[in-house]
From Swiss-Prot:
Transmembrane segments: none annotated. HAMAP family: Cytidyl_kinase_type1. It catalyses: CMP + ATP = CDP + ADP; dCMP + ATP = dCDP + ADP. Keywords: ATP-binding, Cytoplasm, Kinase, Nucleotide-binding, Transferase. The lineage of its organism: Bacteria, Pseudomonadati, Pseudomonadota, Gammaproteobacteria, Alteromonadales. ATP binds at G12, P13, S14, G15, A16, G17, K18, G19, T20. GO terms for biological process: nucleobase-containing small molecule interconversion; pyrimidine nucleotide metabolic process. GO terms for molecular function: ATP binding; CMP kinase activity; dCMP kinase activity. GO terms for cellular component: cytosol. It is an enzyme of class 2 (transferase). Its EC number is 2.7.4.25. Belongs to the cytidylate kinase family. Type 1 subfamily. This is Cytidylate kinase. The keyword Nucleotide-binding applies.
Length: 230
């Protein structure tokens, strides 16, 4: 079944440039944006706000089904703004408390199913840019416009290192590289929704390509898929 509105999926590992490209595509095309990586953190924060116990699968499932969240493009350097029930929670959801809570709520099958339906509901006119890890393989498999961004582990570690350094964190690049390689191995070899490109996805290795060139390649692919102005 085709989606209700044009959907562009942007999958790939952390540090490949998904967030930046997704934001630029949303701005260029006037499409809405879905940051699926933040969904579980947002749900966890909503549960905390509404005093929902993190082991109450029924209440969490109901909350997930009606999750009032928006993802808004803005200043590229600041990234995507995450708005929960009218409140900017972009910083709050990155807290350790939200991270721990997100791991708990994600363990419930009914919660995951409710969030899957909630993510699909983002597909509304004029269109959607869906940023994630399994958008093209699980959430929106019917869309013809699928992108998969990747980059070498070394390049992604360097990007993450620069980002953390810019934000005042003292980190070691060797440790970041090790963590990235371990996560890649887990993600690519897990039994449920492994991190792999959809068969019909355009795979772009961003290691030695400028953001401008990646954006141009992505827009050309979208134009061919949907015949929308590139």
């Amino acid at each position: 079944m085709l989606e209700r509105a044009p959907v562009v999926t942007v999958d790939g590992p952390s540090g490949a440039g998904k967030g930046t490209i997704s934001q630029l595509l949303a701005e260029k095309l006037g499409y809405k944006l879905l940051d699926s990586g933040a969904i579980y953190r947002v749900l966890a924060l909503a549960a905390i706000h509404h005093n929902v116990e993190l082991d109450n699968e029924e209440s969490l499932t109901l909350l997930a089904a009606h999750l009032d969240v928006q993802f808004i493009t803005g200043n590229e350097s600041k990234g995507i703004k995450v708005v929960l029930e009218g409140e900017d929670v972009s910083t709050t959801i990155r807290s350790q408390e939200c991270s721990n809570a997100a791991s708990k709520v994600a363990a419930f099958p009914r919660v995951r199913e409710a969030l899957l339906r909630r993510q699909r509901a983002f597909a509304e006119a004029p269109g959607l840019i869906a940023d994630g890890r399994d958008m093209g393989t699980v959430v929106f498999p019917a869309t013809p416009a699928k992108l998969f961004l990747t980059a070498s582990a070394e390049e992604r570690a360097q990007r993450r290192y620069n980002q953390l350094q810019d934000n005042g964190f003292d980190v070691k690049i060797d440790q970041l590289l090790s963590e990235i390689k371990e996560r890649d191995d887990r993600d690519m070899n897990r039994s449920v929704a492994p991190l792999v490109p959809a068969e019909d996805a355009l795979v772009i290795d961003t290691t030695n390509i400028s953001i401008e060139d990646v954006l141009a390649m992505a827009l050309t692919h979208i134009h061919k898929s949907f015949q929308v102005p590139a």
